[in-house]
UniProtKB/Swiss-Prot annotation:
Residues 1-26 form the signal peptide. The keyword Signal applies. This is N-acetylneuraminate epimerase. The active site is at E242 (proton acceptor). Gene3D superfamilies: Kelch-type beta propeller. Homodimer. Kelch repeats lie at residues 48-92, 94-147, 149-186, 187-232, 236-285, 307-356, 358-387. NCBIfam families: muta_rot_YjhT, PRK14131.1. Its EC number is 5.1.3.24. It holds the Pfam family NANM.
């Protein structure tokens, strides 16, 4: 998740921030990324934030949240093919990257979903490929480290269907064969959500044993690119996301991992924006804790897709314009409210919890541009402000 445009306002003096390791001082402003990053992956180890891949190719960067004045530091390049939408999480002081999608080789005719896994060691500043394969496609999935050292993974596109669709699309010249191209797209995009066979298991990877397991099935429709926030040890909030290409859900679910199993509970949906604009849900939103609340910001959707799906038109986003949202919501554990606005519509960037707010890193704007900007959404439970 990641972005912002326009002139940076200078902070007067130096703001005091209390991070998990104690009180630290923020620089005059949060440093921009060296390059714009969208559809990338991110993780955090202590006070080090890591962001890369996606539109940055194999680039990988780190920011010391205790000393942001040092800026983003280039780390070792990712050693796999450039990938979008990888699931990434930290465990045992290392960072693990699973799946994603991209071209296996530069001359490949079409992208695929990868079934590979890699680990980054900050101590040696090096990547290694793991001797394992993901059980299913995990592009668009969310990964999170658990207290026992394992990594839980939610959602993910179906590799078999995704790979075949993109190969078939790549084999047709849509200018010379427009009818065949349209028929293929309509056939794939017109399926009901269940037909996409997205990952409906809560997978768990154990770095110590280099093996995979399951924490149980998701009782809801599996989704991809949801917003995710850690609520407490073993407690995670999954908000919105896609339930099929082009169609989001406004639902939010609380997942509690206890005694080797994932326990799901539906909580309040994202609220309607107004009486005339129903909640479409969002994919690629930014999320994290801000004090006692969870903030969910930005994301992208297609206005009108929910109405189309309700009418049985399952190619729900056909002919609709994609919208990059600037809405920010706050969740107090029971109810949602509209907290304010981002400086602009943004999606598919990175977010990190910070005292007093949510650090928003990069992302994609309404023009599809990968953004460099980094800013803090400050929230005191009543008012939202932006610290650049």
């Amino acid at each position: 998740m990641f972005s912002l445009i326009g002139a940076k306002r200078l902070a007067i003096g130096i703001a005091a921030l209390a991070w998990s390791t104690g009180a630290v001082m923020a620089s005059e402003h949060w440093p921009d990324l060296p390059v714009g990053i969208k559809n990338g992956a991110a993780a955090r180890i202590g006070n080090m934030a890591y962001v890369g891949l996606g539109s940055a190719g194999t680039d990988f960067y780190a920011l010391d949240l205790n000393n942001p004045s040092k800026g983003w530091v280039k780390r070792a390049n990712f050693i796999g093919p450039a990938t979008n939408g990888a699931a990434m999480a930290a465990a045992g002081g290392k960072i693990f990257a699973f799946s994603g999608n991209g071209k296996a080789t530069p001359d490949a005719k079409s992208p695929i979903i990868f079934d590979t896994a890699y680990v980054y060691d900050p101590g040696s500043d090096g990547w290694s490929k793991l001797d394992t394969q993901t059980p299913v496609g995990l592009s668009g999935a969310k990964a999170v480290g658990l207290a026992d050292g394992r990594i839980a993974i939610f959602g993910g596109y179906n590799k078999e269907l995704f790979d075949k669709y993109l190969a078939d699309v790549g084999a047709i010249d849509k200018d010379k064969e427009p009818e065949a191209y349209r028929k293929l797209v309509d056939s794939y995009m017109g399926m009901k959500p269940e037909a996409y066979r997205w990952n409906d298991e809560v997978l768990v990877y154990d770095p110590a044993g280099n093996n995979w397991g399951s924490l149980g099935a998701n009782p809801f429709l599996p989704n991809c690119d949801p917003a995710m926030a850690t609520m407490g040890e073993g407690d995670f909030l999954l908000v919105s996301g896609e339930i099929k290409p082009g169609l989001r859900t406004p639902e939010a679910k609380l997942v509690k991992i206890r005694d080797g199993a994932a326990h799901w509970q539906k909580v309040s949906d994202l609220p309607p924006l107004s009486g005339s604009e129903p909640q479409e849900g969002v994919a690629g939103a930014y999320a994290g804790k801000a004090g006692d609340d969870v903030l969910v910001a930005g994301g992208a959707n297609f206005k009108g897709a929910q109405a189309n799906a309700a009418a049985g038109k399952w190619f729900a986003h056909d002919g609709l314009a994609k919208s990059w949202r600037d809405d920010v919501y706050a969740f107090d554990g029971k109810d949602w409210k509209v907290a304010g606005k981002l400086p602009r519509g943004l999606a598919y960037g990175a977010a990190f919890d910070a005292p007093g707010g949510l650090l928003v890193v990069g992302g994609e704007d309404r023009d599809g541009k990968a953004r460099k900007e980094v800013f803090l959404l400050k929230w005191d439970g009543k008012a939202l402000s932006v610290e650049n």
